[in-house]
Amino acid sequence: MSSKSSAWQVELPVHRLERNLIFLPGITYRVVFDKQKALDLASRWSAKERSERVAAIASRFGLSSKHLVACVPGYPDSDTCTVCVVNGFYEMSETTVVSFKGVTRGYIVQSDEDTATVEIQEETSVPHPDTKDMIRLFDNIDQFLTYYKDEGTLDSEDKEERSRHILLRLTPLATLLNAQLSASDVSAGLKRLRQAYGRKSGDFAHYNDVLVALFPFPIELKISYLRSKGAERIEVFNKCVAFANKVFEEHLDTSYLAEIWSSLDHHSSKAQSNVSRSQFISNHLRNLRRLVEEMGLMRVTGRGSRTAEDNDENKSIQDFVDSLDKYLINEDGKRLIAKDFERLKQMQSSSSDYQVLRAYLEIIMDLPWQRLDSFVESVNVDLARAREQLDADHYGMESAKERILEYLAVLNLHNQKQPRHEPEFVYGTGDEPTTKERPASTLKAPILLLTGPPGVGKTSLARSIATTLGRKFQRISVGGLNDFADLKGHRRTYVGAIPGLIVQALRRSQSMNPVILLDEVDKIGSNSRKGDPEAALLEILDPEQNTNFHDHYIGFPIDLSQILFVCTSNDLWQLSDPLRDRMEVIELAGYNYMEKVEISKKYLIPRQLERAGLSSDAVAMDDETILKMATHYTSEPGIRNLERLIAAICRGKAVERQMGEATKTVTVHDLAKYIGSPSHLRATAAGETKFQKGYGVVNGLSYNSDGSGSLLRFEMIGLPGSQKMNCTGRLGEVLLESSQIANTLVGYLLHNNLVAGTQEFRDELLKRYENTSVHLHVPEGAISKDGPSAGITMTLCLMSLVLRKKVPETLAMTGEITLTGKVLPIGGVREKLLGAHLAGKVNKVLLPRQNRKDVIEDFIYNLRNRELAKELFAKFLDEEEQLLKEGRTHAGEPEKWVYQTLGLEIVYVDDFSDVLASVWEGEVLLTGGIREARI
């Protein structure tokens, strides 16, 4: 691939970088200046920014600012520079931080002390690097960091392995690389770069620049890379990658050192061996001391004597206070920290106040304050890879996944904006410019509330979100919290005061933008004499307030706006209205049994096999076996108990393997052997008795408290007597009202002769109704039942009793009914249809007409092609809206899918006359009133 470019020359101000420092395009750098140097730099634009060529360059690269500067690397005789845009000047107490963002390369034609004529070449194409070598480099980096930090190797039984690990840590090159590559901004950038190169598509020129900026390549290679063009630049880049791979694979291989170390035991006596090792260690310590002296951290004044600075235990705090201007800390906070440190120096170290104040300053120093002189890499997160990561971790949960992808898309667009913040220059009385405060970030992290029953994966989804974003993860359990100081921190006047849980999470994660999970927020303590912790959450979770969150222990504002808060709850309505209003609610429904089968095969079984020490093919379970466990051994919306059962089977297989009698296959008949008898034996029907007449029994559908659906049998028996209805079976208030509506509606139909037939037939029905005492019972009387969705079931049950006409056992129904016979929509359609399917005998279900949209949503939810799903969803909704306007119904793809998947025929009913026509296929009809009301 060739490199084509157009070039033009422009005169720009010059900023010469410190020694061995180099800027690269696409990276944001923050550099600390003293105030006079910053003013000198700003004053150079008074004439330059009016240049037409400068304006043309700014326009060509999409820059809203014309404040361009040629940043010359800190390397002798450099004829190359990086053209940067100055995003802003940020005033500190004694210094000024200038934010540069690299725009493009420049080649110096002529220069003096303050200005340079720079030739800018705009490249339109750059050859792609060898991504295999890139992936190899990232693998080497991961292996090196993992091995270097592995404390477990020090306890290894292999003496040679222990020696190799210790010698690696003694290697200066390894120590320096670990320090640089472990930095939070560098590690996050490398992680995103690995994902970007793994896609084998994208802006590789930008990715290459970011990698050269992140990795500590030699300055000669960096200069050569900056200077080169087109295909030559790729050659230099490949040399950089080859150099880094050689460092990890050869120079950091301590096997040879370990051999020499162990050979001391064989080539000399034990005493001589110990002497050699002692000399090695003493030489290291001596040279380390010289290095410390070279850095100016220690001054030796004479043999055996040290200065007071050597014994100053507050040296680290002093260094932190001296460098406060390099951190993004509130100005009031900087003043308070400096004041407290001055007070600390006046105290006696033996006093209790000294220890309290020192502990406070150490906590402040340990917080991950953002450095203003660090650079910000802007590698975009790959949405396709993020989607793959979320799908690999969790099954379903489409609404939550789509919300995370939306946030990533917005984050990518913010990263692509140039510049991030347009500098705002405010000129005073003279020619010297001053600057405004740093503007707040316009990108606010969303605050999500995942609500749903236990065990559906809310907590693990939050962890997966952190992995996808490449951020640190912290979990805070707020269930039962009854002291607001646990969140806001304790004031330092109290004995044993500590920061709040939010600040502690920042300190543990060493990041100012982690993903923080606030678990079980619906179970947080209520008002007490210690304050209301839920009210404390209002400030934390409000994007307009948490930019200045005030922790009582810290004592000055902290910016929490870049934290991604994810909250979880089981009951959404346990939260107060103000708190609920601050969060984006994402409802996670319980899994149906088909989903549990898929989750078991893809996630639970492989995970439990690994935990049991078995191979991935050591256990084989078919869908029928897994479904049996899900339906007969568990009754839950989530998968926790199901995973425990699978774990028990895997442990049983592990025992069999050790006994030499293991087989792979686990069938339905083997379940009792491994996990015992089912917790409840589900019957497909209550069964008919010998004296049952057959009528007065109807199958309803229920949505259970555990998030599942099931068949619910309604039974009615009539006795001679005055007309009344008794109800048993622990029925709730709403269900009892539905029974009264059913009784009244049937009486109304009979008294008004609305049942089709001869007058003699109608009179007989009315007489039978008026002289029958009805008893309604819903089996499983120990379980309380409530809700309006059994309205048509009870009405049909009473009508069946009066007509003495049997309702087919293969039929089930659900729907609320009104006094006028209208059938209203209900909830839990998805779960109820699955419950009808699992009953084993139902092949036809009556649903309210207005619930067709729920069937459509379930059909769309189960489509794997999300783009196609969105198109079909819009199409079906438009079609459904038109059908409702015309008063028609339609059976299309969603209904066909239900029949193919669950074996259920869906019939939609709009009023009770539709129910009768569908149940008895036209044998029983209503005439007059209700039919006329529909017309």
Curated annotation (Swiss-Prot):
The active site is at S789, K832. Its main location: other. GO terms for biological process: protein import into peroxisome matrix; protein processing; protein quality control for misfolded or incompletely synthesized proteins. It is found in: Peroxisome matrix. InterPro entries: AAA+_ATPase, ATPase_AAA_core, Lon_lid, Lon_proteolytic, Lon_Prtase, Lon_prtase_N, Lonp2_euk, P-loop_NTPase. ATP binds at G452, P453, P454, G455, V456, G457, K458, T459. The keyword Protease applies. A motif (Microbody targeting signal) lies at residues 933-935. It comes from the Eukaryota. GO terms for molecular function: ATP binding; ATP hydrolysis activity; ATP-dependent peptidase activity; serine-type endopeptidase activity. Belongs to the peptidase S16 family. ATP-dependent serine protease that mediates the selective degradation of misfolded and unassembled polypeptides in the peroxisomal matrix. Necessary for type 2 peroxisome targeting signal (PTS2)-containing protein processing and facilitates peroxisome matrix protein import. This is Lon protease homolog 2, peroxisomal. It comes from Pichia angusta (Yeast).
